[in-house]
A protein has these predicted regions:
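PRPP-associated nucleotide enzymes
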Residues: 1-334
Length: 334
């Protein structure tokens, strides 16, 4: 199976989307997206350990996984209470999935996991150009009418789309179907676009498919667009996350702006796999970025850099800031 997702249209009415509080429990703030005429449900969760993970690139190894446990478990509890998860089947898309504590969180919240499936895919190149993705390893289990649980970083989204299409085809061949799909992600706006389109496709042959429930940690970020290396000239298109055009959890925004360096990092999360397993490569990437900034310091437009990282022009009125942040429906004390 080879597939490459080419459409990158902007989300319709994104400027009209607002975040509204859903719950605040056990130190976890949860917000829901509304106003976008979505087919699916989208949430943003914010918690002290996930904020530390994203604001401190020196959090590495097992701590990357451990940082997500509290927020994930609390969201699992919420989804169980809302009856969004009944019988669960975990899909591990290697190796990004290994950073997400889905099985542990299900265990903590007394959600039975019927099976765990594993997949991996690799990029396909022709004449030095990426032409698609190919499934390299696959061990699938079919749990009819179940909730498929996935944890993955979504930047461009090609890997996720490729694997989901493969799984859905597999279920159809087995004469089975999925009730819904719950996705936990550190990811960007591209994920919303992709999942809306996928739900439309899936409902053609599974009309009763309830859709995706997507949980973003700390915000729905944006990727630098193709050909855009950022004001610094160092950023990687379709890989590096930043705030512009996204929706950021208020507590994460507040914590980041109360510190000196995190806002200017190359990426909100960096390479999740390297950060967990090839720590030396992660550290080298962080240092290479900051050394690159130092080398370019005299030529970088500081005002443009600040506006890029904040995601809006300066100066900005409070009313315009609320609108730009999608905070208009939040209590002003938040």
């Amino acid at each position: 199976v080879v597939f490459f997702w080419e459409e990158r249209a902007m989300i319709e009415n994104w400027k009209d989307v607002q975040i509204v509080p859903e719950f605040c429990d056990q130190g976890v703030d949860c917000y829901r997206l509304e106003g976008g005429h979505f087919l699916n449900e989208y949430y943003i969760v914010s918690e002290a350990e996930t904020r530390e993970l994203m604001n401190h690139p020196e959090v590495v190894g097992y701590e990357v996984y451990a940082s997500l446990v509290t927020a994930t478990s609390q969201m699992m509890y919420y989804l169980k209470e809302k009856k969004k998860i009944t019988s669960a089947n975990i899909l591990s898309i290697l190796r990004g999935a290994l950073n997400y504590p889905l099985e542990e969180s299900c265990y903590k919240e007394h959600i039975r996991v019927h099976d765990i499936s594993f997949m991996s895919s690799e990029r396909v190149f022709e004449n030095g150009e990426m032409t698609g993705l190919e499934i390299k390893y696959c061990k699938l289990a079919t749990v009819p009418n179940s909730t498929l649980l996935i944890g993955d970083i979504i930047a461009s989204g090609e890997t996720l789309v490729n694997c989901l299409r493969y799984v859905i085809d597999y279920y159809r061949k087995q004469g089975a179907k999925l009730r819904n799909i719950v996705l936990f992600t550190i990811g960007g706006t591209q994920g919303v676009e992709i999942l809306e389109k996928l739900t439309q496709e899936i409902r053609v042959y599974w009309p009763g498919f309830e859709g995706f429930v997507t949980v973003y940690y700390e915000g729905i970020f944006s990727c630098y667009e193709e050909g855009n290396k950022g004001v610094s000239g160092i950023n990687r298109a379709l890989i590096d996350f930043y705030w512009k055009g996204g929706i950021i959890a208020p507590a994460f925004r507040h914590e980041t702006l109360s510190m000196q360096n995190p806002l200017f990092e190359k990426c909100t999360i960096y390479d999740g796999g390297a950060r967990r397993y090839e720590i030396h490569e992660h550290i080298e990437e962080v240092l290479e970025f900051w050394n690159g900034v130092l080398e370019r310091a005299d030529s970088i437009d500081k005002q443009a850099l600040l506006e890029e990282k904040l995601g809006h022009p300066l100066p900005i009125s409070y009313e315009d800031w609320l609108k730009d942040c999608h905070y208009e429906k939040l209590d002003k004390k938040t």
